[in-house]
Amino acid sequence: MKKEQLLDFINKYHLGGKIESAVWTFDNDEITTKFRSGDKGFMGIVTKKNFGFAENCQLGVLTTGQLVRLLSVLGSEFDFGLNKQTANDEEKIVSITISNEGARINFMLADLTVIPKAKGLKNEPDYDLSVTIDDEFIDLFVKSKAALPETKSFTLLKNKKTNKYEIVIGYSTTNSNCIYIPVEVSSLVDDADIDKPISFSSEYFKEILAANKGAEEFKFTVSYKGISHTSIKNGDYIMDYYLAEVQTDI
């Protein structure tokens, strides 16, 4: 197995350390993970086809950051194996072994019951607006977030003077340091319009953008009901990330 491939998969859910725990599901050479934040304000699904691991199983990865650090010890390619134990006539995968000629790593897995469950949205709403996302926007958003690191949210609103949409980092109802980024918005339903600002986590959105820059297909849609959906396709990857509306920064 190539280390670059495994790390690329991890990066798309680990999101700079925002998500530590996830269940990896291997099924017919496809790997999928569903995950959510502790406050349940963010969840996602990452799937990669043609992963190159044939055994169907589920692995509970409790400390993804630790696994990433362990992988740094190895070179560009390694063997990936499962270690199993039997108790009460039940076979369980308890750890994985990752090895090459230089070193061998044993990484302990967690029971699946201790990993936060992310089953998906119970009632996914219809989306009202679609925002154009490209690499230029990604670069600008990431730089803007770095310039205002204390800002926890970004806001989609319509500028009353220009009648055009903007994404604002640092938005507040009072005067504040903020960055306005003009965006192209299209309506997904007739006469869709946002009559008030709607905000989502800039912490997670920044990491989503950074982890998926250069993707072939990138869609960001927003529902008045307080949900945003970032849908990304790139080669063998399909990613879906959902954010719940948050309060704007004070």
Predicted segments with their positions:
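Short, well-ordered, aromatic-rich surface patches in folded extracellular/luminal domains
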Residues: 105-121
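DNA polymerase processivity clamps
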Residues: 1-107, 127-250
